[in-house]
Regions:
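Nucleotide-activated chemistry modules centered on ATP-dependent adenylation/adenylyltransferase
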Residues: 1-178
Length: 178
C-alpha cells in the first residue's frame, strides 16, 4: 500500500513514517503548508525536512509555497474557531489530490501526531475529503509518539518550531512567552 503523508514539519514526520514503515506501508511525504508564517519560518521547516528526508531516505513531494491560498481560504474567519479546520481542510484536500495524481492508494497527515491539534476534527475532515475525492484516508492516532519524535528531532539537530505555523498561532505563542 502506498500512502501520501501530508507533512507539516520534520519532527512530526518521524513517528508516523516509522510506524507506517513497520507495517509495510510505503509512505511518501507531501510538504504543502501555505499557512506557515513568516516565509523564514517556512524555509526553516522546509530545510529541516530536506535534512531528515536525506538522512532517512524518505521521498518528499514539495508543493509550491503560496500563503495567499491560506489567507483567501480563511478570509473573514481570522479570529473564528473555524480557522484551524479550514486550514486543515485546504491542506488535506491538496494532499488527496496529489495522492490521486501520483498513484497513491491513500492519504493521511502528520497533524495526527500532535497533541495540540483537534484529532477528531482532522479525522472527520480527512474522511469527508476521502469520500469527495474517491481516495482512502488513513487514520491512526500517532500522538503516543509525539514526545519521542521531538526528542529524536532535537538529538538529530533538526529545527523544532515553537508554534503551529500560522501568524495567529505565532502571535499566541509570543503572547504566552512574555
Amino acid at each position: 500500500m502506498k500512502i501520501l503523508l501530508h507533512t507539516c514539519c520534520a519532527p512530526c514526520l518521524i513517528y508516523p513514517y516509522a510506524q507506517m514503515s513497520k507495517k509495510g506501508v510505503k509512505a511518501s511525504g507531501f510538504f504543502y503548508n501555505p499557512n506557515i508564517y513568516p516565509n523564514q519560518e517556512y524555509q526553516f521547516r522546509r530545510q529541516a525536512l530536506i535534512a531528515l528526508s536525506g538522512k532517512q531516505n524518505i521521498d518528499i513531494i514539495y508543493a509550491e509555497y503560496n500563503p495567499r491560498e491560506y489567507f483567501t481560504a480563511i478570509q473573514n474567519k481570522e479570529s473564528s474557531p473555524e480557522r484551524c479546520a479550514i486550514c486543515w481542510s485546504i491542506r488535506l484536500k491538496r494532499t488527496a489530490s496529489a495522492a490521486k495524481e501520483n498513484g497513491f492508494d491513500m492519504f493521511t497527515t502528520t497533524l495526527l501526531v500532535s497533541p495540540y491539534q483537534d484529532q477528531d476534527t482532522i479525522k472527520e475532515i480527512g474522511n469527508k475529503i476521502a469520500r469527495e475525492e474517491k481516495i482512502g484516508f488513513y487514520y491512526e492516532d500517532f500522538r503516543p509518539g509525539f514526545k519521542t519524535a521531538y526528542a529524536q528531532a532535537k538529538q538529530d539537530g533538526l529545527y523544532c518550531q515553537q508554534y503551529c505555523g500560522c501568524m495567529y498561532s505565532n502571535e499566541a505563542w509570543i503572547y504566552r512567552t512574555k
